[in-house]
Amino acid sequence: MKNTIYMAPMEGLTDFTFRNAYEKIFGKGKIAKYFTPFISPNKSEKFLAREIRDIDREHNNGINTVVQVMTNDAKDFIWTARMLYDEYGYNEINLNAGCPSGTVVSKNKGSGMLNEPKLLDKFLDAVFE
């Protein structure tokens, strides 16, 4: 049985420089997917310069990169997903519903979304509408 390995993100550590170095030195094709540290959509509907650098396809050439998004707002998730697909060519996006940070959870983001199943259902219904 073959194991599938995914590289989990860690904010401030696993940016494109880390992902590329890890793949070159250790991964060598063994890592199925590398997840980016989360992008947190903003009301301006634009990515920050550091986010653009991290998700730029040229900076992730040759490694299967999945962009992680942290939001509890379906509209923000949808515009982010569209932009990642249309402008950056990503066809897989990951919703962060697991971050246990107190700051994140207090905003009902990350694992905080799991505390409110009805809100999570509403979010997912809107995304997949």
Q: Where are the language model's segments positioned?
A:
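Extreme N-terminal starter segment of soluble prokaryotic enzymes
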Residues: 1-5
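General structural feature for long, well-ordered alpha-helical segments within catalytic domains
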Residues: 6, 18, 76, 80, ...
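Gly/Ser/Thr-rich beta-alpha loop segments that engage phosphate groups in nucleotides
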Residues: 10, 14, 100, 112
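Glycine-rich, positively charged N-terminal anion/phosphate-binding segment
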Residues: 10-83, 87-90
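Non-cysteine beta-strand/loop elements that form the S-adenosyl-L-methionine
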Residues: 36, 92-101
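Alpha-helix-loop-beta-strand connector modules within alpha/beta enzyme cores
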Residues: 56-64, 113-129
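Surface-exposed, active-site-proximal loop segments in enzymatic domains
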Residues: 101-116
